[in-house]
Amino acid sequence: MLRNSKYTAEELWQKDHDHVIHPFTDFAQWDEKGSEIMAEAEGIHVYDTHGNKFIDGIGGLWCVNIGYGREEMAQAIADQVRAIPYYSPFNHLSTPPAGILGAMIAERTPGDLDHMFFGTGGSMANDTAIRFVHFYWNQKGKPNKKKVISRIDAYHGMTYLAAALTGIEFDKIGFDQADELVEYVACPYPYRRPEGMTIEEFGDWLIEDLEKKIETVGAENIGAFIAEPIMGAGGVIVPPEGYHKRTLEVCKANDILYISDEVVTGFGRLGHYFASEAVFGIVPDIITSAKGISSGYQPLSATIISQEMYDVMSIPQADGALFTTGFTYSGHPVCCAAGIKNIEIIDDEDICGHVRKVGPYFEEKLGELNDLPLVGEVRGKCFMMCVENVANKETKELLPPEVNVGGRIADHAQKNGLIVRPLGHLNIMSPPLTMTTEQIDEFVGILKGAIEATQDDLVREGVWNG
């Protein structure tokens, strides 16, 4: 019997299998495999219902920044439940945690991004950002500026509009899209840039591609450009030097708002509360944030806008209509209380400083995997990393999708106590930000062994010659 559960591991598996629809389910394997259920966690480790212990190399899902088992978080959440667990955020009503958290975040955002709308997840944050963009341009008397430019292989969520912003075609199979609102430009993917092109030339080509798209669609029809500072689910794509500054300049020149999707990069993953200015040197018009904002202890997100946007959006409408964007759980007091305590922990323990100090060591140790024949590139920054696996290091040719190389590596790693995320030919890592150098050594040792075991399997099966 599991601790704090009246059900056995087998009973929990069956209930989950029979009744829960999970995100990103492979129904070809679902009936047989079901879910592996994680029941407990502490620090950087999670434990399944059978008591097996794993290093959580994906931080829940890019989000458990402060690590698991924080008693002070549990206490803050419990205290808020006792005080007032919920009240309506509509019609000029609020609770104390929303304003406190808003002020704390405003102290840490770049520029004058001081106003924020709270939600419950990154998809909602990005959906809300587009609603704000449309409302803003309507208020400015430019109602045609509705289009949004996104990028191929970008990931911005899975609500109806956020799914359209997402540029990963595989994620859209079988679903209808709101694609008429979205235009896509090239992915800033240096490893797979056109053959014969230098990084500098590639950077120029990307900017030309954006400028051509704006010219084709018409700046008068484009409301915003949205970009992750480092692309997450698209493969941890770090753009060429100066890319974000140059895209922002193009947007400003064409009267287009700039949305920085910091759902993954925010709250310390790259060593700063927000990466837009501190890492990439830009101050966008909108920042969207979730995941690390509460370290996953409660569902929370924020759509953060500039003073100029707020000034325009807060002008009373001539017909007396209300600003009607809102959700039942916007500014939820328990979620906001978790966000407050999360920031206090990050500050008290200087977790951002820890990431700036230890993150380069994680990069260095993972970089040693480049010597393995199967590894084409190790990339990323600090605690946001990826290994791209290839059939041929020189040509960068991929193994056939049915080989499932990323999944094989992840399976070998998990058997030895490490969870990494497989995405086709990639393995993605986003561990809790509290990971130490000793834990990094263990992490990379297991991952190296998993890649080597996969290499041996592929050679033995005759699907790869090494």
Enumerate the predicted regions with their spans.
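Conserved N-terminal phosphate-binding loop of PLP-dependent enzymes in the Aspartate aminotransferase
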Residues: 1-466
